[in-house]
Design a protein with these regions (language model features):
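Cell-envelope/extracellular polymer assembly enzymes that use nucleotide-activated donors
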Residues: 5-7
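A conserved acidic beta->alpha catalytic loop
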Residues: 25, 36-45, 49, 60, ...
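Short, well-formed alpha-helical segments that are part of the catalytic scaffolds
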Residues: 9-28
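Conserved donor nucleotide-binding strand/loop of the catalytic core
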Residues: 44-75
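Catalytic-site signature of metal-activated, phosphate-bearing donor transferases
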Residues: 65-71, 89-255, 261
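Acidic helix N-cap motif at the loop->helix transition within catalytic regions
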Residues: 17-20, 41-49, 91-92
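Short aromatic/hydrophobic "clamp" motif used to bind/position activated sugar donors
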Residues: 79
Length: 261
C-alpha cells in the first residue's frame, strides 16, 4: 500500500502529555487531520510543530459526530483513525507498506497493548479496533460513552500492535471515567436485557462486575505477571466498574435523573 493513500485522523482535547509521542510515529504521513475540541493546554502549540498536521476546531457534542466531521476533512482513500494516546509500533508501520487490500476488504483491525507509565502490559481487556478503513465505505455511530465504526465490506486483521499509552494525570482519568459511566449507565438502562451482551448483563447486576473484572485482569489476563503495573491497571478497571455500579444504583433510587434524552 502506498502510504500517501493513508491519512491519520486524530481527535484531541488537552492531550499535551501524549501528542508528541503519537505524532513522532506518524512522520511518514503526507497529511494528518486533527479535530480539536478547543484545547486549553499546550495541545495546539505541539500540533503547530508538525508541518503535515492540519487542525480543525469543533466543539465536542458526541464522539460519533466528532469522528464523522473528521472523515469529511480527509481526501485520501484510506483513513487511519487514532486516539491521541495511540502510538504505532514500527512493525505496524512496516506492515502498512506491504498491504495489498483486495477490493472486498474495506478495513483492518489492529490489536492493542495497554501501557502503564510507558510499559506495555502482557494482557489487557482492550479489544481489537478497526483503525484502518476506506473512507467511502465507513461511518461512525454513537454507542454508549464511545462510538462504533460501521464499515460496508469485509475486514482484515493486522499483525502489528498499537500501544495505548496515556500519560495524562490520574485526576483527568477519573474525570473522564465518571462522564463515561453516566452515559454507559443510561445505555444499559435503556437497552432491553435480552439485547445485552453477557458482559453487559453482568455489569447490570451492579455489585458483581467490579470483582469479576478484578479477577479477570489479574488472573485470566495475567496481570499478576506485570507486577505493580498489572495491579494498577486492574484497580483502574475495577474502579471504573464501581463507578458504573454506583450510577446504576443511583438510577434505581432516583430514576427521574436517568430518563432517556
Amino acid at each position: 500500500m502506498d502510504l500517501s493513500t493513508i491519512t491519520p485522523l486524530i481527535l484531541t482535547y488537552n492531550e499535551a502529555p501524549n501528542l508528541d509521542r503519537t505524532l513522532q510515529q506518524l512522520t511518514w504521513a503526507h497529511r494528518i487531520v486533527v479535530i480539536d475540541s478547543q484545547s486549553t493546554d499546550e495541545t495546539l502549540e505541539i500540533l503547530s510543530r508538525y508541518p503535515q498536521v492540519e487542525t480543525f476546531q469543533r466543539r465536542f457534542d458526541t464522539h460519533a459526530q466528532q469522528w464523522n466531521y473528521g472523515l469529511e476533512q480527509v481526501n485520501t482513500e484510506w483513513i487511519l483513525s487514532l486516539d491521541a494516546d495511540y502510538i504505532l509500533t514500527n512493525a505496524l508501520i512496516n506492515e502498512f507498506k506491504y498491504l495489498s487490500p483486495p477490493v472486498d476488504i474495506a478495513g483492518y483491525f489492529a490489536r492493542y497493548r495497554y501501557c502503564i507509565f510507558g510499559k506495555p502490559l502482557r494482557g489487557t481487556i482492550l479489544p481489537p479496533r478497526q483503525v484502518l478503513f476506506r473512507k467511502s465505505r465507513s461511518i461512525y455511530i454513537d454507542d454508549g460513552h464511545t462510538q462504533l465504526l460501521q464499515v460496508n465490506g469485509n475486514s482484515g486483521q493486522l499483525k502489528g500492535y498499537i500501544h495505548h499509552d496515556d500519560r495524562k494525570p490520574l485526576s483527568r482519568w477519573l474525570w473522564a471515567q465518571n462522564r463515561y459511566m453516566v452515559i454507559e449507565a443510561k445505555k444499559l438502562l435503556q437497552t432491553p436485557t435480552a439485547q445485552l451482551s453477557l458482559g453487559d448483563k453482568i455489569r447490570k447486576q451492579k455489585l458483581l462486575a467490579p470483582f469479576v473484572i478484578l479477577i479477570y485482569c489479574l488472573i485470566l489476563k495475567g496481570g499478576l505477571l506485570d507486577g505493580w503495573r498489572g495491579l494498577y491497571y486492574a484497580l483502574q478497571r475495577m474502579f471504573a466498574e464501581l463507578l458504573l455500579s454506583l450510577h446504576l444504583i443511583e438510577a434505581d433510587q432516583n430514576p427521574t435523573n436517568h430518563r432517556p434524552g
